[in-house]
C-alpha cells in the first residue's frame, strides 16, 4: 500500500499542471498520484497520459466527463489506494522542504499503534503577480503531536481549515461516505 494518494483535479490545466505534478513526484514510490482529467478541452489529458506512461507505478489517470472540482475529488476518493489522501489542485504545488517533513511524519505515525484521521499543515495562498502571500495558519491547534477534536478547542471568527491544508486517512473518507457536490469548488 502506498503511504499517500494525491488526487489532482485537472480541467484545462495544460499550461501549468507540470509544475504541480513534478513537485508531487519527489515522494517517489511512497505516493500514488491520481490525475483526474475532468473533461478538459485542451491537452490536459495528453499530458496526464504521458506522466502515467513515464511513471506507471506512481501516476494513474482517470478521464471523465466534466463534473466540476467536487466530482473530480469524489473520483479521487473512490480510486485512492494510499493510506492517506490529499487533494492538490493542478495550479498548486508543494514546498519541497515542507513536503519531505510531512512525509517523514506520516511514515513515523503510520508505523505506530495510534490511528491518525487528519494531518493539518499551514497553507500558503500565493497569487501570481501579487506581492503579498496569504498564509493560512491553524495557530490555535496543538503542534507536532496527535490531538483530539476536544483539545483543538474552538476556532476564532474568520479562522477555518481549508481542504488544501488537510491530509486525511483514506479509509475515514470512504467509511463516512464523503461525497462533494458536483460542479462546486
Region spans (language model):
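Glycine-rich, basic loop-to-helix element that forms the pyrophosphate-binding segment
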Residues: 64-80
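Short aromatic/hydrophobic "clamp" motif used to bind/position activated sugar donors
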Residues: 85
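Conserved nucleotide-sugar donor-binding catalytic segment
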Residues: 149-185
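Short beta-strand/loop segment that forms part of the nucleotide-sugar
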Residues: 31-39, 60-65, 89-90
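Conserved donor NDP-sugar-binding/catalytic core segment of glycosyltransferases
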Residues: 100-134
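Short, well-formed alpha-helical segments that are part of the catalytic scaffolds
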Residues: 12-26
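A conserved acidic beta->alpha catalytic loop
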Residues: 23, 37-46, 67-68
Amino acid at each position: 500500500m502506498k503511504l499517500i494518494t494525491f488526487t489532482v483535479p485537472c480541467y484545462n490545466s495544460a499550461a501549468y499542471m507540470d509544475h504541480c505534478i513534478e513537485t508531487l513526484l519527489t515522494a517517489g514510490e511512497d505516493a500514488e498520484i491520481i490525475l483526474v482529467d475532468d473533461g478538459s478541452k485542451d491537452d490536459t489529458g495528453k499530458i496526464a497520459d504521458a506522466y502515467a506512461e513515464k511513471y506507471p507505478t506512481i501516476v494513474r489517470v482517470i478521464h471523465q466527463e466534466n463534473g466540476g472540482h467536487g466530482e473530480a475529488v469524489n473520483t479521487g476518493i473512490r480510486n485512492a489506494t494510499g493510506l492517506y489522501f490529499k487533494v492538490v489542485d493542478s495550479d498548486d504545488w508543494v514546498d519541497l522542504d515542507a513536503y519531505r517533513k510531512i512525509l517523514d511524519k506520516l511514515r513515523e505515525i503510520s508505523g505506530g499503534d495510534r490511528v491518525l484521521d487528519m494531518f493539518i499543515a499551514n497553507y500558503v495562498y500565493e497569487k501570481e503577480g501579487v506581492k503579498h502571500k496569504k498564509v493560512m495558519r491553524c495557530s490555535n491547534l496543538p503542534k507536532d503531536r496527535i490531538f483530539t477534536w476536544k483539545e483543538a478547542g474552538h476556532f476564532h471568527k474568520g479562522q477555518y481549515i481549508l481542504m488544501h491544508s488537510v491530509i486525511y486517512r483514506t479509509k475515514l473518507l470512504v467509511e463516512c461516505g464523503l461525497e462533494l457536490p458536483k460542479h462546486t469548488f
